Amino acid sequence: MKKVVVGLSGGVDSSVAAASLKEKGYEVIGLTLWLMQGKGQCCSDGLVDAAQLCEDLDIPHHVVDSRDLFSNNIIDYLVEGYQQGITPLPCSQCNKTVKFGPMLNYARHELDTDTIATGHYARIAYSEKEKRYQLLRAVDRNKDQSYFLYDLDQDLLSGTVFPLGDHTKTETRRMATQLDLHTAEKPESQDLCLIEAHGSMQTFLDQYIETHPGEIVDQEGNILGHHQGVHHFTIGQRRGIGVAAPHPLYVVDLDPGKNRVIVGDRETALKTECMVKRVNWVSIAPPQNPIHAEVQVRYRSKPTGVTIIPLDAEAPGGRVKLVFEDPQFGIAPGQAAVWYDQEILLGGGIIEAFS
């Protein structure tokens, strides 16, 4: 009987992943990472629901105290990023350094198996042509989470199973009801676990970053207003700027050195290219020449045509230049740019600078 360790957050998706694998005859072991204290999908409430699920399914449940790991890799990462005037993407960082990597390591060394599973909506397939594991979009494009998984390497992909990748969210809910899981009607998490625990990103950051009032200026340096901290803003932001103007204003740049927020019209926030660092080529080997693909510069952004120009062929950690077919709005350094060939996730990296 194949043994698999299932990451359990206490939500309906991971619950169905565990239950469905057991239905298929797998020896299932539940594993919950204790990431932080307080309310939230991956916090104390989730631990209780995960424990209840394992009792209902009659499977072992392991809890790993990952609070220090989460603090060092995610909280520090976020705080340092916002202090530098960038907008970090914690989910992809968390998936690789806090969740998948440590989970697979724990499974191999403590539970004698080399297979883990989660409730993510994505798919993995091995390509004989490329001689590597490929990451694919989920069947349910509205729930597809492959964007947040672009940084997983071949070792992690080879040991991971996504039971929900071929299902829609509606089907998952139906399966939860049919399996009589107590999480079947549990509301879906709407925000980052940090936001759920603290109410807002601003509230969370204010615990770690001292507020320093500064100026809100236009691109000519004219003072239009004042702010209470650069870390309260992100590029592309329109609401909550606090400046009255005859036309809509957007945050187009942040200057933490001068403690300034620069605003302008929407056209100013449109960019034709950007640089990407810490590139991870997932489904193909790092190309030597420019390639064409479709890219997402935000999780919910519409994919757009792009030319990817390698600047450093070595992976991971290489750099590329992205040249967009259509100008992109609100590109924020620190966020991820992820490129696809139809449903195949080719690679991705961290947006570094734009022009």
From Swiss-Prot:
Its EC number is 2.8.1.13. The record marks H120, Q335 as: Interaction with tRNA. GO terms for biological process: tRNA wobble position uridine thiolation. ATP binds at G7, L8, S9, G10, G11, V12, D13, S14, L33, G119. One of its GO terms (cellular component) is cytoplasm. It comes from the Bacteria. It is found in: Cytoplasm. Residues 143-145, 298-299 are annotated as: Interaction with tRNA. SUPFAM superfamilies: Adenine nucleotide alpha hydrolases-like. GO terms for molecular function: ATP binding; tRNA binding; tRNA-uridine 2-sulfurtransferase activity. InterPro entries: MnmA-like, MnmA-like_C, MnmA-like_central, MnmA-like_central_sf, Rossmann-like_a/b/a_fold. Disulfide bonds join C94-C193. It catalyses: S-sulfanyl-L-cysteinyl-[protein] + uridine(34) in tRNA + AH2 + ATP = 2-thiouridine(34) in tRNA + L-cysteinyl-[protein] + A + AMP + diphosphate + H(+). Keywords: ATP-binding, Cytoplasm, Disulfide bond, Nucleotide-binding, RNA-binding, Transferase, tRNA processing, tRNA-binding. Its main location: cytoplasm. The active site is at C94, C193. Pfam families: tRNA_Me_trans, tRNA_Me_trans_C, tRNA_Me_trans_M. The keyword ATP-binding applies. Catalyzes the 2-thiolation of uridine at the wobble position (U34) of tRNA, leading to the formation of s(2)U34. Belongs to the MnmA/TRMU family. NCBIfam families: PRK00143.1, trmU. PANTHER family: MITOCHONDRIAL TRNA-SPECIFIC 2-THIOURIDYLASE 1, TRNA 5-METHYLAMINOMETHYL-2-THIOURIDYLATE -METHYLTRANSFERASE. This is tRNA-specific 2-thiouridylase MnmA. It comes from Acaryochloris marina (strain MBIC 11017). The gene is mnmA.
